[in-house]
Amino acid sequence: MVLKDFDKNLEKYAKLLVSTGINVQPGHTVNIVIDVDQAPLARLLVKEAYAHGASEVIVSWADDFVGRERLLHAAEDRISNVPEYRVAEMNYLLEKKASRLNVRSADPDAFAGVSAERLQKSTKALSLALKPLRTATQANKVSWTVASAAGKEWAKKVFPNAATDEEAVDLLWDQIFKTCRVYADDPVAAWKEHEEKLDAKASILNKEQFVKLHYTAPGTDLTLGMPKNHVWESAGSINAQGEHFIANMPTEEVFSAPDFRVAEGYVSSTKPLSYNGNIIEGIKVTFKDGQITEVSAEKGDKVMKDLVFENNGARGLGEVALVSDPSPISQSGITFFNTLFDENASNHLAIGSAYATSVKGGENFETEEELREAGLNRADVHVDFMIGGPEMNVDGIREDGTVVPIFRNGDWAI
């Protein structure tokens, strides 16, 4: 590694993820999901979590190679079922109210060439088996943070013209540190200032309580309904124990959930989507009566269609997020082939399940039917795809029909 002060900045990054991301408190159980190639960062995270008083730190190792070999060669009945020990681990983490830190560094093409049918079977089985964990996460019952680390294959995809693999990894780490404000003299203070700016936009939108949003851009003319008493959130969240955490690092978004029963028109993607080890590009989606009626992709069409039509609830939307086109990630001009980064360069929507916190009091609803009645989609998946750009306009429509500009030419107008 030749990146200047890399070890120092990696340690700062670990401290930031633990203290400001999942905000580890004395007595917490912590679950870190991380790739085997990122062991040095994992060890720093474990050390830092215990330094903050964690009672237990559990590391769940991931490996693209192992995952690919399983999908290619494992017996069919093993692909479509989840081992009991995975469910037992999930139940243990839920019982302990474990904070979850997911550090992603996967190869965007890890599962390219794998049978779409086998991939879909595996994804669906895992989604169903781990649904209680997803439900708890989407209701902020626990603290959770998604972050990234520079994996070699991912770095080579983002920086194909780098002279060496090491240079590509350095370039990607540099972007991770920049966008996560690690280079600031005081990263924690820098994040607090950033949160305040995003909170100001969320506050305006929450006061307005628009009944509809109207998106227009080349290839897009889409109207979405908004639930009654919807809530716009930004960087920071509060878990069921009253503890602050940041779900995504980096983040530039202000987000809520649309009413899944009201969506009319069409929308086109503006960035590639990395989903299940496949790259999907040129996505076009048509909505009628709140549901996706048609979907296509120039690349990854089969994977995209399976995502929408083979997963329960995936024909509806679960998230609407506003991101200024002049955001630092967008202005970098880099396509990261990683949703965590690319969604923070662009307005985006999410296919599938909504966060319970997107309506007032939703985190306290006890049944999925209550959430549906409030307009929140329930599904087995939640997958963001990017639709924003410098030509996008977004209008808010009040109950009396008044149209209020929210975005003009890809930037905030409120």
Predicted features along the sequence, with ranges:
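Active-site bordering "gate/hinge" segments
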Residues: 1-264, 396, 402-404, 412-414
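Glycine-rich, charged/polar anion/phosphate-binding loops
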Residues: 130-132, 198-200, 209-211, 251-254, ...
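A short, compositionally biased
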Residues: 205-211, 279-281, 386-393
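Short linear motifs in exposed loops
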Residues: 225, 295-296, 407
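Long, well-ordered mid-to-C-terminal structural blocks that present hydrophobic/aromatic surfaces
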Residues: 256-312
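A structural signal for short secondary-structure junctions
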Residues: 260-261, 276-278, 286-287, 311-315, ...
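Dual-mode signal for accessory low-complexity, basic/Gly-rich regions
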Residues: 292-363
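Extended hydrophobic packing segments that form well-structured cores
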Residues: 368-414
